From Swiss-Prot:
Pfam families: SDH_C, Shikimate_DH, Shikimate_dh_N. It comes from Rhodospirillum rubrum (strain ATCC 11170 / ATH 1.1.1 / DSM 467 / LMG 4362 / NCIMB 8255 / S1). Belongs to the shikimate dehydrogenase family. GO terms for biological process: amino acid biosynthetic process; aromatic amino acid family biosynthetic process; chorismate biosynthetic process; shikimate metabolic process. The gene is aroE. This is Shikimate dehydrogenase (NADP(+)).
């Protein structure tokens, strides 16, 4: 039951109706019997600055930030976590008691925690990683891998200028060697890889499949996709058919929500099969 003392958080985006975050946080609120609510907040780009400035006055505990606002929100924060600064985007905002806005980015955290939960024997230091894509998701994934001890990275992207910009941003704080490759060169980058990550939208419902020959991967390699609709993307299906270990992208969404929920509602939530089923809409 929600009372007049309820703590309220939400997700800001444009559009925001597709977000599964309300289902995720709603599950945790119900599980822990918390007097609180989590609501979708549709905020157009031109209204973002006003919306963020109003959060403390409205008494919100904080918000998640989704497309297209993650990078634009960064400049509107009063303080940033180190990982948000390194990634250059914000996906979690905490309204502090003094009215200041603290910006965080938990996407990389969610990515790593998903791998650790689904494949407990996996370690970032096991070997080089190949990351497909060079957008905002790739930036969070790469930063988290470097922080966790990945010994080398290869960025595969059609737009080499964008890949180069990402590599330079990462090199500003990490000494780990980073190699660039085009899509045509991608199969040749797989031989020594311990991890292959797709951060593009290829394979998502309504998008073309990701066409990549995976036979160059070592039998011990792990393949993961941040796409979770469908849960098993064509990339993961191809990897599984080759006998490779795979991890779907749903857990990244679930785990990235944990730090924000704990900051807003004072409870450290768990990610388990019941939560996965609830977010997927399964009975």
């Amino acid at each position: 039951m929600i009372t007049g003392k309820a703590r309220v958080a939400g997700v800001i985006g444009w559009p925001v109706g597709h977000s599964r975050s309300p289902r995720l946080h709603g599950f945790w609120l119900a599980r822990h019997g918390i007097d609180g609510a989590y609501v979708p907040l549709a905020v157009a780009p031109e209204a973002l600055e006003r919306a963020l400035a109003a959060l403390p006055a409205l008494g919100l505990a904080g918000v998640n930030v989704t497309v297209p606002h993650k990078e634009h929100a960064l400049a509107r924060m009063d303080a940033l976590t180190e990982r948000a600064r390194r990634i250059g985007a914000v996906n979690t905002i905490v309204c502090q008691s003094d009215g200041r806005l603290l910006g965080d980015n938990t996407d990389g955290f969610g990515f790593l925690e998903n791998l650790r939960q689904r494949r407990p024997d996996w370690r970032a230091g096991h070997g080089p990683a190949v990351v497909l894509g060079a957008g905002g998701a790739a930036r969070a994934v790469c930063a988290s891998l470097l922080e966790a001890g990945c010994p080398a990275l290869t960025l595969v992207n059609r737009d080499q200028g964008r890949a180069r910009a990402l590599a330079e941003a990462l090199a500003a704080w990490s000494p780990v060697p980073i190699t660039l490759a085009t899509w045509d060169e991608a199969p040749r980058t797989l031989g020594g890889a311990a991890l292959l990550v797709n951060t593009t939208s290829l394979g998502m419902v309504g998008q073309p499949p990701l066409d990549l020959d995976l036979r160059g991967l070592a039998p011990s390699a792990l393949v993961t996709d941040i796409v979770y609709a469908p849960l098993e993307t064509p990339l993961l299906a191809r990897a599984r058919a080759l006998g490779l270990a795979t991890v779907d992208g749903l857990g990244m969404l679930l785990h990235q929500g944990r730090p924000g929920f704990e900051a807003w509602f004072g409870v450290a939530p768990e990610v388990d099969d019941a939560l996965r089923a609830a977010v997927l809409g399964k009975p």
